[in-house]
Amino acid sequence: VQPVERTYFHQVQDVFEGFVIDVAGTLHSTAHGRGLKVWYDDSTREHYEAQLIRVDGAVVLEIGFHAEYPKVAENDAVLGRLLGEEQVWRGELGDEPEAGVFIGVDRWRRISEVWDEPDPDDVDVAIEIAARLADYVSVLEPLRRA
């Protein structure tokens, strides 16, 4: 996967942070050439990302929530709690999110969706990415903390 221009995901980060100002907890975020990672408080193993990944040889953008503990059982427990509230988050996020095994790492879990690779010159798409990631955070973070 070729990194997108470094400043692109920094643009996403700047816009994203404005969208989630009312979400409880201490926001941490890091932008890099292939994406943006966001977590609250000390919860680095349970986080949100907008990141470029490769699927069947194509570069795509994955947006959503990840549980990335070393043990499958821990990740399954996190996903299970969120699936117990699926009616709530589906009502807000729609049919696009897929819940299950992480793309490329079988032991991790996700609630996320895949978009076409973004054009790094398209500021409007950067705003859309930030808004969609903020949707995930705004809906899932209160459920994750419950």
Please annotate each region the language model reported:
Residues Q2-R109:
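Polyanion-binding interface signature
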Residues W89-A146:
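Charged, low-complexity intrinsically disordered regions
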